[in-house]
A protein has these predicted regions:
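Helical cap/lid subdomain of alpha/beta-hydrolase-fold lipid enzymes
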Residues: 86-205
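Serine-dependent carboxylesterase/thioesterase catalytic core
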Residues: 2, 7-18, 22, 26-40, ...
Length: 205
């Protein structure tokens, strides 16, 4: 695998880049350069985080060393990445793997969002109600997206991970937070980045 392919990793709500470090390490072993991006997820809004991520993507897109840039995000990080791509997909963006994404909202966000709106606005933005931020967010255009859901996930149900424009979707054993540490999940991420499909054994029936 040529080292001119770059993967940008984006963590989720209440986490930091340390959570994505094991996955970043496995991707590096598979031959990818990695950028493990961090942001203050509880503070500010998804729009602000998305704008900051977009600045990073535009800088990387301008680097001659990077021939192709992929995205791998977990949980709310997937929504931040979707927001970053709202104004258009940078020229070198390749594929996007979403891990447990609340693409249709989260039941816990629906429960606690109104109570935390003043201090932690991002939680309410992930609510399942039809008029929530995440359910009004446009889908990325012209991008190959693969979604990996966790079978045991009390934060984001499998049904809420789907995105109409997704190219592939699988459900793996594991939980919402621990799935990013699983070697099998890392293998599926690499498979999608290389082939644009997950392995047939895990593909959602």
């Amino acid at each position: 695998m040529p080292s001119d392919e770059l993967v940008v990793l984006v963590h989720g709500l209440g986490a930091n880049k340390l959570l994505m470090w094991p996955l970043a390490r496995r991707l590096a072993r598979a031959g990818y350069r990695t950028v493990n991006w961090s942001y203050p997820s509880f503070l500010r809004t998804i729009e602000r985080h998305g704008a900051n991520l977009r600045e990073l993507l535009d800088r990387l897109d301008a680097e001659p060393e990077a021939a192709r840039i992929h995205l791998v995000a977990h949980s709310m990080g997937c929504i931040v990445a979707r927001q970053a791509l709202l104004s258009g997909v940078p020229r070198k963006i390749g594929r996007f793997v979403m891990l447990a994404p609340p693409n249709q909202g989260s039941p816990l966000a629906s429960l606690f969002g109104p109570l935390t709106r003043c201090c932690f606005p991002t939680i309410d933005q992930l609510a399942r109600r039809p008029d929530s931020f995440v359910n009004r967010l446009l889908e990325p255009d012209g991008l190959e997206i693969g979604v990996i859901a966790a079978r045991v996930d009390w934060l984001v149900g499998v049904a809420n991970t789907h995105l109409p424009c997704q190219r592939d979707h699988i459900v793996v054993s594991g939980t919402h937070s621990l799935m990013v540490f699983q070697s099998g999940v890392a293998r599926e991420v690499v498979e999608f980045l290389r082939q644009g499909r997950f392995t047939a054994a895990n593909r959602t029936k």
